[in-house]
């Protein structure tokens, strides 16, 4: 894990808290106190809290752009699943605790949520429904409501970019409540 802003890179450091909170079916890891915790909900697995740094990941595109192109990443643990004894295995990564026993219902709810994006516009053309679903990825949740990450993934929310993108992301899809909130 990097736990960083997308404009920076992570390097091995002593500020990272390697401690895991593990209980049956759930792991919580919060490497830095000012960032949200990472919650991993999992089916039965063997957990090894190894806390290892993997050094010197090379990013060719960043190097071409003259940016910091070398990064260290921290692996808080290893989960080992026995696929021979399970029909399927679920792993949920989130910033809020999740219950792995609800993995199927989470998946179903997300499929229904994405499908519902096209209902207000009463649209069935595959290209349009694909674009509508893709447009939703630029709308991000904040503690104070929703925002537009118009230059996702390179930029944060900026007022000018938000106003340029807002009509195509919300208004043409009849997502008036989302537009109003933004």
Each language-model region and where it sits:
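Acidic, mature catalytic/reactive cores of soluble proteins
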Residues: 1-182
